[in-house]
Amino acid sequence: MKCPFCGFEESKVVDSRSTDDNTTIRRRRECLKCNKRYTTYEKIEDFPILVIKKDLTRENFNKEKIINGLIIACQKRPISRKQIEEIAYDIEKTISNSMLTEIPSNEIGEMVMARLKELDEISYVRFASVYRQFKDIDTFLEEIKNLRT
C-alpha cells in the first residue's frame, strides 16, 4: 500500500478491525520509511446482479421491489414487516450465493411464491394472482386447488 505522505510502497498493519456492519475492514498502517500512520479500508467488491425482465431488458436487482410486492400481498394478514424483510433478504442471499450475474425475473417470482406458500396461503394466492396475471375466477380456483394438493 503506497504511503499517502511519502509514496513509499511498503507498510505494516498496526491495527485491524471490522466496522460495525461487518462489511468493511479498517486497517491502521505505518509506513516503513517515514513512520507516519494512515488508515485504509478493505471492502468486498460487489458485482451487480442484473434481472432479465419478460421483454428481455435488464435492470439492477432491487430487493425493495420484492419487499413492496410482499407488503401488498400480505396486507391485512398476520405477517410482520420483519418476516417480509427476512424473505427478501433470503432471496437476495440465494441469488448472490448462486454466483449468477443475471437472473430471469420469473425465477425471482417463483422464489417469492415458494416462500409465501410456506408462510401464508392467502398472501400466496394474492401474489400469484398478480404475478401469474390471473384472468378469471377459474384461474383462482385452479391455483387454490393446486395449493391444497
Swiss-Prot record:
Keywords: ATP-binding, DNA-binding, Metal-binding, Nucleotide-binding, Repressor, Transcription, Transcription regulation, Zinc, Zinc-finger. One of its GO terms (molecular function) is ATP binding. Residues 49-139 form the ATP-cone domain. Its cofactor is Zn(2+). Binds 1 zinc ion. GO terms for biological process: negative regulation of DNA-templated transcription. Pfam families: ATP-cone, Zn_ribbon_NrdR. A zinc finger (unnamed) spans 3-34. It comes from the Bacteria. Belongs to the NrdR family. Negatively regulates transcription of bacterial ribonucleotide reductase nrd genes and operons by binding to NrdR-boxes. This is Transcriptional repressor NrdR. It comes from Clostridium beijerinckii (strain ATCC 51743 / NCIMB 8052) (Clostridium acetobutylicum). The gene is nrdR.
